[in-house]
Amino acid sequence: MIRIREAIIVEGRYDKNTLAQIVDAPILETSGFGIFHDRQRLALLRRLAETRGIIVLTDSDGAGFVIRNYLRGAIDPSQVKHAYIPDIAGKERRKRTASKEGKLGVEGMRPDVLLEALRRAGATIEGEETPAAGTRITKADLYAAGLTGGADSKAARQRLLAQLDLPEHLSTNALLEVLNALMTREEFQKLYI
């Protein structure tokens, strides 16, 4: 079991149960869209963000991104890290049919995939060194790499998302955030410019 400093925010109880088997960290549920109307739970998430930081780990479907974006606007962004699971087609064992978009959610991911998503997000893992921060990637770097502002930019971003095993719904700003968690500006320029 891996101990993580930050609290982890997931959508529901099955996500929480899956994660609790592999990490030792506070894990809280949003109760799906219930977080939109639960002021007390949101206040708790804000307090946790201030004291220990939080990691948002939602499904890679449209609903997961709605919840993630709500939290992004409701909690100080400097206290929040975002972990993204890859788009993997399938259905969870407990369900009769696949989800609306046909993708596995957090509860259906293998433990190694979840741990990798948390590491990519920059989780503070007890006993592991955190890499020193390098120069950050900017929107200008994305433009120079043809990932924004061009005729084929969307297709180029989709190829990059697939290459990095990231969800297809990732916005350009979220991609920038993930790239900064994965690599330095220098590493990005060597690979993509």
Residue ranges and their predicted role:
Residues V10-E11, T58:
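Short beta-strand scaffold positions
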Residues I22-V23, D76-S78:
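Short, structured coil segments at secondary-structure junctions
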Residues L44, G62-F65, N69-D76, D112, ...:
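Phosphate- and other anionic-substrate recognition elements at nucleic-acid/protein interfaces
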Residues I85-A132, R136-K139:
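Activity-critical C-terminal alpha-helical subdomain
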Residues E116-R119, A123-I193:
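C-terminal, charge/polar-rich interaction regions
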